[in-house]
Amino acid sequence: ELSGSIIGLKRDKFIVLLIGFFVIALVAVAGRFGIFTLCTLIANIVAFIYFIKLYVSGKDFMLINVLMIIFFSVVTLLILGGFSRKNIGAILSTLITTFLIFALYKISLAYTGDLHYELMDYIAGPNDLENIFLSGVLVGCLGAVMDVSITVNSAVNELVNAAKSITLKQLIKSIREIGHDIMGTMINVLMFSYIGGSLSIVILKIINGYNFQRLIQFDISFEIIRFLVGAIGIVSAVPISACVALLFFRKGMSKNDSVANNSIADVNDSSRRR
């Protein structure tokens, strides 16, 4: 005979309520862009579940990781911004930066040795611990890198279209100023997100007598690595995005430079005549 007992309250109504508030607020504030944002969220969640099932079925995890990063970048930026030069530039900037982070991570491990992956909170098994952690690091910083990439490419696009006589030197100076503004905020956002994720376990272990040095060495070292790798990605995304954007808009810049040079020449000629 099958029997059961009540062991707790069913709290999924609260989650459904929050989802409802989120959808209503997003559509009310952003309109059509909010609907596109919801489409990207749904597509990325479905793709993430599919990629996890591929890994469970025995597929190569690094190949899955590469496909996942490409899919997230392409789908998110194309659905939200459409097929345009600035979005293609943002996609290329994101992928170049992400795979640069991957290469730097591998080079660092080759010189310093492997991390103690057995100290992670949840271990899926004895194999692929390094790849699982690396995948989490790359996916974790992907959003920040995408944000920086689309910001820089959009800024270059707007500057070239709005200021017809802007020179390459002026454009690079503007990109540098934009990069300074977004780097500081994005790095702090990344830090706060990782602090929020590990705050409960940190407080719990401090209450139970863990000292701060032991906590950093054995418990939050992985969070620190995630933050540092993501911060390097944000910093790297600014010059990479700038180079990609300048290459994509170089035809416009050459015309702009010639216009600026012609304007300077006209001014010089008029001054000589005077």
Predicted feature descriptions by range:
Residues 2-7, 21-33, 52-60, 158:
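Short juxtamembrane and helix-loop transition motifs at transmembrane-helix boundaries
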Residues 10-13, 58, 175-189, 228-231:
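Loop-to-transmembrane-helix entry motif
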Residues 28-29, 195, 201-274:
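Hydrophobic alpha-helical transmembrane segments of membrane transport and translocation systems
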Residues 32-120, 130-134:
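Transmembrane alpha-helical segments that form the functional core of multipass membrane systems
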Residues 99, 141-148, 182-187, 223-243:
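Hydrophobic transmembrane alpha-helical segments of multi-pass transport and channel proteins
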Residues 143-159:
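Short helical (or helix-break) motifs at transmembrane helix termini and adjacent helical loops
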Residues 147, 168-202:
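Pore- and gate-forming transmembrane helices of large, multi-pass membrane proteins
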Residues 159-169:
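Juxtamembrane helix-boundary/capping and inter-helix hinge elements in multi-pass membrane proteins
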